[in-house]
Amino acid sequence: MPTIQQLIRTERKTLKTKTKSPALRGCPERRGVCTRVYTSTPKKPNSALRKVARVRLTSGFEVTAYIGGIGHNLQEHSVVLLRGGRVKDLPGVRYHIVRGTLDTAGVKDRRQSRSKYGAKSPKE
């Protein structure tokens, strides 16, 4: 523990918090272009083919992003919007693609939690 004299000489340094989504550069969302769209397998207890995309962002970063929902229309050179949020069972995936914006279509025939998947209100 420092003495009072040491604290007078040099004040305490405040610890900087590390961001969980550095590629966004403090923005809520970022635009990017898909460089590769593929499937990936999750970590140990789970088993599936998760849909992911490699995206080159306007901030210069190239990141891996998860495509949520059932079915998608993304391919190479698709322009997408990215938000933060990791996928727990996919190592290295720290971003989500926002459905229903830019080139990404919303999920078809979605009735519940529509706003999360960019689905329009079903016509009666």
UniProtKB/Swiss-Prot annotation:
GO terms for biological process: translation. One of its GO terms (molecular function) is rRNA binding. The modification 3-methylthioaspartic acid is found at residue 89. Residues 103-124 are annotated as: Disordered. The keyword Ribosomal protein applies. It comes from the Bacteria. GO terms for cellular component: small ribosomal subunit. With S4 and S5 plays an important role in translational accuracy. Interacts with and stabilizes bases of the 16S rRNA that are involved in tRNA selection in the A site and with the mRNA backbone. Located at the interface of the 30S and 50S subunits, it traverses the body of the 30S subunit contacting proteins on the other side and probably holding the rRNA structure together. The combined cluster of proteins S8, S12 and S17 appears to hold together the shoulder and platform of the 30S subunit. Belongs to the universal ribosomal protein uS12 family. Part of the 30S ribosomal subunit. Contacts proteins S8 and S17. May interact with IF1 in the 30S initiation complex. This is Small ribosomal subunit protein uS12. It comes from Prochlorococcus marinus (strain NATL1A). The gene is rpsL.
